[in-house]
Amino acid sequence: MKMLHQVLIACVIGGIMGILGHVKKRGRLEKPRMTKRFIYLGFLEDWFIGMTASILLVLSADPDSGIQLVILSIISGYGGEAVLRSFDFVRELNSGGEPAESKRQTKTPPE
């Protein structure tokens, strides 16, 4: 039951921080809209990314106290995209492959 409470708290805090990060990045709260080619989710995208990042970080870190939980949720929710990219980077390193950035840098330019 303790883990469920931690995940719920991480969802709430991460979602709020994701929305605050969206406002800081864009300068305003953008509503979802549809264009001819795609659906732009606006602030919902950053809300979902912040929530997901904070859940993943809390589940992987397993905080001992409430203060650690809140701090981890705030940090991961605010920088949600960077946290998710770091999880992808760690997964690539653990699978024995090189990260995509290093593969791109080692290629020689065509002549």
Swiss-Prot record:
Topology versus the membrane: Multi-pass membrane protein
Highest taxon listed in the record's lineage: Bacteria
Primary subcellular site in the record, as a coarse category: membrane
TM region(s), chain numbering: 4-23, 39-61, 65-84
Protein name: Uncharacterized protein YtvB
Keyword set includes Cell membrane: yes
Subcellular location: Cell membrane
Gene Ontology CC annotations of this record: plasma membrane
Pfam families recorded: DUF4257
Keyword terms of this UniProt record: Cell membrane, Membrane, Transmembrane, Transmembrane helix
Gene responsible for this protein: ytvB
